[in-house]
Amino acid sequence: MREILHIQGGQCGNQIGSKFWEVVCDEHGIDPTGRYVGTSDLQLERVNVYYNEASCGRFVPGAVLMDLEPGTMDSVRTGPYGQIFRPDNFVFGQSGAGNNWAKGHYTEGAELIDSVLDVVRKEAENCDCLQGFQVCHSLGGGTGSGMGTLLISKIREEYPDRMMLTFSVFPSPKVSDTVVEPYNATLSVHQLVENADECMVLDNEALYDICFRTLKLTTPSFGDLNHLISATMSGVTCCLRFPGQLNSDLRKLAVNLIPFPRLHFFMVGFAPLTSRGSQQYRALTVPELTQQMWDAKNMMCAADPRHGRYLTASAMFRGKMSTKEVDEQMINVQNKNSSYFVEWIPNNVKSSVCDIPPRGLSMASTFIGNSTSIQEMFRRVSEQFTAMFRRKAFLHWYTGEGMDEMEFTEAESNMNDLVSEYQQYQDATADEEAEYEDEEAIQDE
């Protein structure tokens, strides 16, 4: 029933992914050995969205784990839920991609990709009605970005009508792990624009800010960041896994959020975010959730929605609440901040309600917005890319793996096109649309 196949690649992807499985196992009452220890029938009703049931009654995640070096895999395997995964679904090489996109996409990754695809096929054949794939990866490194995008394009060829959702960690503006991040990210975006259906854009710096500012953590670890991400990931699919009054799924999400096919990069947020100590003092109300979820400080990527306009947005509420109140709040947000929504898409906020809240909360909400301000992120990466590419710095690492400079130029111009598309729709007004069509007609001739 409506399965989602989960794929995680590279160090970042595997760490986010394993955190995500901890959250989902917890929600469905599945212990680290795969046995069901929950208390409610609802946990089992649609457990097969993410799990296969083995013959002995144990639940095995429908997950494929890949990396070009064994290190992260070993730590996943020895982690709290390491024993739950199917051992054959760990696919890894030995050499590593060394933060080099070309190695992940063309050389090392290309050697490993067939064994990954075999596992993906095997998992997909197990499914009743496969809804789509979710991929966790980062765009700054070599494996998640290079091999991740290679896998996405291969899956695209083989399953063209299934949804492809990615959780992509972009390089942060101030915090950089590797000097070649702008190259890797630009080459990846070039692929994601063409081959993914929906990209949830995350970045470490924004997550750090949330940890400092809202959660009051003095020294946030990657574990804390990944916890935020996994809360959002679980929120995106809760409608598939638990009954609700207003359901959404990956395809409905896409139809409601993507006005133009290339503009499928979303900012995500989660509410309520409270510091660990002060959780018990919070009474949650729908207005409070709404306020926190639309707050620019809560966005998990370093772009400020106040600098652009929302093309569309989707709010997924969880918990027992009145749908009437949810609708009122959403209309309220749009009326009060009408300048931040494009006027040529009327009622552009979709809401959905799922009855089961996350563990330890009475209600929660996940926010997904398609805002033109996401271009800040692409523009920033693009500037860093150009600065290095003008001097052809570090290029030999890529050309040495058989890449051509043309590919870089193409990726760069594709990214810049994306930025200007966002800008064009940010500036568009309802009555200007006619002029655009005239202009386009002239250009086409």
UniProtKB/Swiss-Prot annotation:
SMART domains: Tubulin, Tubulin_C
Entries under InterPro entries matching the protein: Beta-tubulin_BS (IPR013838), Beta_tubulin (IPR002453), Tub_FtsZ_C (IPR008280), Tubulin (IPR000217), Tubulin/FtsZ-like_C (IPR037103), Tubulin/FtsZ_2-layer-sand-dom (IPR018316), Tubulin/FtsZ_GTPase_sf (IPR036525), Tubulin_C (IPR023123)
Example GO BP: microtubule cytoskeleton organization
Gene Ontology cellular component list: cytoplasm; microtubule
Domain of life: Eukaryota
Biased composition regions of type Acidic residues, renumbered to the chain: 429-445
Residue positions binding GTP: Q11, E69, S138, G142, T143, G144, N204, N226
Region annotation (Disordered) ranges: 422-445
Subcellular location per the Swiss-Prot or TrEMBL entry: Cytoplasm, Cytoskeleton
Cofactor annotation: Mg(2+)
Principal place of residence: cytoplasm
Keywords linked to the UniProt accession: Cytoplasm, Cytoskeleton, GTP-binding, Magnesium, Metal-binding, Microtubule, Nucleotide-binding
Pfam families with a match to the protein in the record: Tubulin (PF00091), Tubulin_C (PF03953)
A single GO molecular function term of this UniProt record: structural constituent of cytoskeleton
Gene3D superfamilies: Helix hairpin bin, Tubulin/FtsZ, C-terminal domain, Tubulin/FtsZ, GTPase domain
UniProt record similarity statement: Belongs to the tubulin family.
Subunit and partners: Dimer of alpha and beta chains. A typical microtubule is a hollow water-filled tube with an outer diameter of 25 nm and an inner diameter of 15 nM. Alpha-beta heterodimers associate head-to-tail to form protofilaments running lengthwise along the microtubule wall with the beta-tubulin subunit facing the microtubule plus end conferring a structural polarity. Microtubules usually have 13 protofilaments but different protofilament numbers can be found in some organisms and specialized cells.
Cross-referenced PANTHER family: TUBULIN
Role noted for this protein: Tubulin is the major constituent of microtubules, a cylinder consisting of laterally associated linear protofilaments composed of alpha- and beta-tubulin heterodimers. Microtubules grow by the addition of GTP-tubulin dimers to the microtubule end, where a stabilizing cap forms. Below the cap, tubulin dimers are in GDP-bound state, owing to GTPase activity of alpha-tubulin.
Protein name: Tubulin beta-8 chain
Organism whose genome encodes this protein: Zea mays
Species lineage: Eukaryota, Viridiplantae, Streptophyta, Embryophyta, Tracheophyta
Annotated gene: TUBB8
